[in-house]
């Protein structure tokens, strides 16, 4: 009976977590614009690097998503990277980090 019960409980997956951190369509567009314009002002409008490092999926491939999320929210002391916690929720930061690692979408 325990085996049957265990099978009936859905497994937690990365897809379920990603879906939970997906913003509403209107908010998603706001976040895309924020990253392209505000982050792009230092990291380059195409996020290929500028005053700040590149934010391409290749450049971020070895960084854990949780690290990127924390940098977005809290900044990097001693650098020009500011904290965005006052404007972004943890869910927003998780979505941005995930999308940066996938190859950030263009604004529609």
Model-identified regions with their sequence ranges:
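Sec-dependent N-terminal signal peptides
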Residues: 1-3
């Amino acid at each position: 009976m325990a085996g049957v019960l265990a099978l009936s409980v859905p497994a937690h997956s990365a897809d379920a977590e990603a879906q939970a951190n997906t913003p509403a369509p209107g908010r998603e567009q706001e976040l895309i614009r924020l990253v392209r314009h505000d982050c792009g002002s230092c990291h380059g409008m195409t996020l290929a690097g500028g005053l700040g490092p590149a934010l391409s999926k290749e450049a971020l491939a070895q960084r854990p998503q949780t690290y990127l999320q924390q940098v977005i929210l809290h900044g990097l002391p001693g650098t020009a990277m500011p904290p965005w916690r006052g404007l972004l929720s943890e869910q927003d930061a998780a979505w941005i980090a995930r999308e940066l690692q996938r190859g950030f979408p263009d604004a529609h």
